[in-house]
């Protein structure tokens, strides 16, 4: 009688097994991780009147985050605040770098000790926007920890874990007559379970800011 195979290691493990796919988990705060999918609505006020040009709500319409754009700043800087006005993240952009690099810090800090992750375009020349995300402890930045990829015409994008095909979140742009008339960009964002939605929301804000800077640069080049 043929004996069943015996495995020295459980299947899928051992010295020659491929590394497991990376997981998202907590990046900003455990309270921003849910056991269930989270649907968010992101509205960018193109013709902004107040200092909050992004508003992020949940499916029930409750305010979760808003983005403050300081008027007097030497750098591209955005502050992600919760519904109570507490600073959650500070997004500091280096737009003039070749890959449009953004540094994201905890709270209202811009100190190196509070750096959580870095976001930059994967290539200088792109047909669609692709962003690489490196956590603060990824010093060499040879492989990204997360990545964001837009699709044709940038009407939607996906956030992936590392170089894998594991989707952590999906964003799509929602065009309405009201949004066009009142100068607003509307985005629908679905964040998968156990994924930090404050982290994902910050990536979408950075994506939009990079797209805006690229459009301005393209317009300037065409006028020259």
Curated annotation (Swiss-Prot):
InterPro entries linked to this entry: LOR (IPR007612), LOR_sf (IPR038595), Tubby-like_C (IPR025659)
Segments of this protein annotated with the region Disordered: 1-23
Transmembrane intervals: none
Signal peptide interval: none
Family the entry assigns: Belongs to the LOR family.
Function: Might be related to the phospholipid scramblase and tubby-like superfamily of membrane tethered transcription factors.
Protein name, entry field: Protein LURP-one-related 1
Organism this protein belongs to: Arabidopsis thaliana
């Amino acid at each position: 009688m043929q004996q069943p195979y015996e495995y020295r290691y459980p299947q899928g493990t051992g010295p020659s097994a491929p590394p497991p796919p990376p997981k998202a988990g907590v990046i900003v705060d455990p309270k921003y991780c849910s056991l269930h999918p989270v649907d968010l609505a992101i509205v960018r006020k193109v013709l902004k009147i107040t200092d909050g040009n992004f508003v992020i709500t949940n499916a029930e319409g409750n305010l979760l985050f808003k983005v403050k754009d300081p008027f007097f700043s030497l750098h591209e800087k955005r502050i992600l605040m919760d519904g109570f006005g507490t600073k959650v993240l500070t997004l500091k952009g280096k737009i003039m770098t070749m890959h449009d690099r953004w540094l994201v810090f905890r709270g209202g800090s811009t100190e190196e000790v509070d750096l959580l992750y870095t976001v930059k375009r994967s290539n200088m020349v792109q047909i669609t926007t692709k962003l690489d995300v490196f956590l603060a402890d990824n010093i060499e930045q040879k492989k990204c920890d997360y990545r964001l990829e837009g699709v044709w015409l940038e009407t939607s994008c996906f956030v992936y874990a590392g170089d894998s095909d594991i989707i952590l979140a999906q964003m799509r742009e929602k065009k309405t007559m009201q949004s066009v008339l009142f100068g607003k960009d509307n985005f629908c964002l679905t964040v998968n379970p156990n994924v930090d939605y404050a982290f994902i929301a910050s990536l979408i804000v950075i994506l939009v800011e990079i797209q805006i800077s690229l459009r301005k640069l393209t317009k300037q080049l065409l006028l020259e």
